Amino acid sequence: MPRNLIDSAPSRRALAHMPDRRGRFRLRDLARACGVAGLAALAAPALAGEPPPGFARLSDLAPGVAQEMRYAGSNNFTGAPVPGYRAAQCWLRLDAARALAAAQAEARAKGFDLVVYDCYRPRRAVAAFVDWSKNDDEKTKPAYYPNVAKHELFAQGYIAEQSGHSTGLAVDLGVKGWDFGTPFDFFDRRSWTGALKRGVARLNRARLVALMRRHGFDNYPREWWHFTLRGAKNVESRDVEIE
């Protein structure tokens, strides 16, 4: 244990016991010296992985955005947690995270909050989608693609063998409590952004697109929830696990 960590503890109380022969302190001794907050700070590096250089955790910039990271659990079209998502966190490239934080600030000022379903997506997750498309398991078909053959999901543009999400510039999102006509990842023409001709859901889609456009994001026309920060070119895709 480096001496300065003990000397800088809030209580500045000396340890009641010396370290053992291997230089280890007992937990209760550390608790006396550092306090609960100090122990949390010492443990923090082991609790969360770091985003790649040039990326940020959205929670650090926009804590008001709800995070329902679907691919970290089984509530998604594959029916299982997806490789690459060891933690349910939204990582984005810093410029995209800042732009999304600005969109959330405008949303909050107008009385609503954004919710994200997917952000940066490791390449291994995209590869897992490809593998899933080739198996015979269709248990999620009624909920996610009732009107599309599984092998047609790529051809119809709902899943891609290379994803903009892997660059950290794309985000899937909605608004908490708003009706958008179809759920997230519902692969059907009804999910096309301009498919609805009337009703509250059509207006909500238009409002979301307008909000995101004001902050630099373009919508993918076949998915009302999918937005990509415009302007960036030749951006590297990544395969760092989210943890």
Specify the residue positions occupied by each region the protein language model found:
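Extracytoplasmic cell-surface/polysaccharide-interacting catalytic and binding patches
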Residues: A46-C119, R123-R222, R230-E243
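N-terminal acidic, proline/glycine-rich, low-complexity intrinsically disordered segments
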Residues: P2-R3
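Bacterial N-terminal signal peptides that target proteins for export
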Residues: I6, S11, D20-G35
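Conserved metal-phosphate-binding beta-hairpin within the catalytic cores
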Residues: F227
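Bacterial N-terminal signal peptides
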Residues: R32-A44
